[in-house]
Amino acid sequence: MLPVVALVGRPNVGKSTLFNRLTRTRDALVADFPGLTRDRKYGQANYEGLQFIVVDTGGISGDEQGIDMAMANQSLMAIDEADVVLFLVDARAGLTAADQGIAEHLRKQNKSVYVVANKVDGIDGDSESADFFALGLGDVNQIAAAHGRGVTQLLTHTLMPLSEQFPDMQVPEDEEADEEIDAEKQLEKLLASPIKLAIVGKPNVGKSTLTNRILGEERVVVYDQPGTTRDSIFIPMERDDREYVLIDTAGVRRRRSISEAVEKFSIVKTLQAIEEANVVLLVIDAQEGVTDQDLSLLGFVLNSGRSLVVAVNKWDGLAKDVKDEIKRELDRRLGFIDFARLHYISALHGTNVGHLFESVQEAYNSATKRINTSMLTRIMDMAQADHQPPVVRGRRVKMKYAHAGGYNPPIIVIHGNQVKDLPDSYKRYMMNYFRKSLKVMGTPIKVEFREGANPFESNTNTMTDSQRRKRKMLMRMHKNNK
């Protein structure tokens, strides 16, 4: 599970600038699909070896009377569910009544709140930030979000205390010698655990109905088992002699009250469920078609590398010409996830619901399919023979060998000379070649390219990202103790 960082502050203090810097395009090929709409307020950040969910609470505003209680419900919910709140203020504008109003609201939330003075570039940050100590929220962290100044130190200072609570927050180091062994251990752990299935979708697409239909078909005794993912409920179940854990984000709490259950939608809770799941079942409303919110959720699923099954709900009762038009639109807008199975269902009447688990099982099997080094290297050689890599700086790129780097999603690591200079088009070609050769269905594939270091280039030892972060923390602590 990843921690949630909420960016709070009045308008024009730099929340969006910091958000954009933290959620810059990631290197993972699974996110490199045309036609993908990315949400502007919720994102997955991978910054300087730290990964987390970041929320831009744009609905927060303040005035002389204090906090505006009519602020957006999603913004309030995001603050309530956040692990860290970064309260941004404008160092150039100084302390305002709106800042004081927001601070008064945040003090009541019992959250880890850090004051962040933005726009300190070109001014005396210490003197211009002094007034913000009056907010009564502790030290003032100085940054220039537009240029990235102080951002790494800020994240290290605010997120490192959570490292034990969120072990997945730190991106693993590239220890290539043990990578294959670690991948094998990860696979063994996955295969020994139940399949975690998250049913996600925007409000009122039928997630609650589908959850209840699935549980009703299984005829099992269902009880509330609180999970670790905020308010999501983890429901154990069995199907076809296979254990599952259904991650319920729809707000359903007890079987006896499902008829009057009101669906509660939380974007943060949905993102946490996606991170926790092995397979994500995305529910789309057939009558509304594919919306930008659906595409945003798809973006989070792809960035997380989770297996994917798409269910188009409310299919019963539609005329044939309407169904044909919907299918054409789905083909056009969802062409970038051609690896995912698409099902047309009616959660209310149970039509085709039973077939969903065939695709869930197929997707999970693809995501956890054991792949050895010799097979991957052979496929890599075949791909090179069919379509040679390009010439870079007068030398043809040479891929030497490939091995497994992880599962769920399958990660394939290719080693060679100048492989990092390969154009994106060739990287996509390699990804698609591996997908077809391995007959992978229902899961994205991530391909990483590594270059061997020249042992004669330098005699100095290079620090890892983890060592650099620890060094910065020690230097900061030493500076504060002076």
UniProtKB/Swiss-Prot annotation:
One of its GO terms (biological process) is ribosome biogenesis. GO terms for molecular function: ATP hydrolysis activity; GTP binding; ribosome binding. It holds the Pfam family MMR_HSR1. GTP 1 binds at residues 9-16, 56-60, 118-121. Keywords: GTP-binding, Nucleotide-binding, Repeat, Ribosome biogenesis. Residues 3-166, 195-368 form the EngA-type G domain. It comes from the Bacteria. SUPFAM superfamilies: P-loop containing nucleoside triphosphate hydrolases. GTP 2 binds at residues 201-208, 248-252, 313-316. Residues 369-453 form the KH-like domain. InterPro entries: AAA+_ATPase, G_ENGA, GTP-bd, GTPase_Der, KH_dom-like, KH_dom-like_a/b, P-loop_NTPase, Small_GTP-bd. GTPase that plays an essential role in the late steps of ribosome biogenesis. Associates with the 50S ribosomal subunit. PANTHER family: GTPASE DER (PTHR43834:SF6). Belongs to the TRAFAC class TrmE-Era-EngA-EngB-Septin-like GTPase superfamily. EngA (Der) GTPase family. This is GTPase Der. It comes from Pseudoalteromonas atlantica (strain T6c / ATCC BAA-1087). The gene is der.
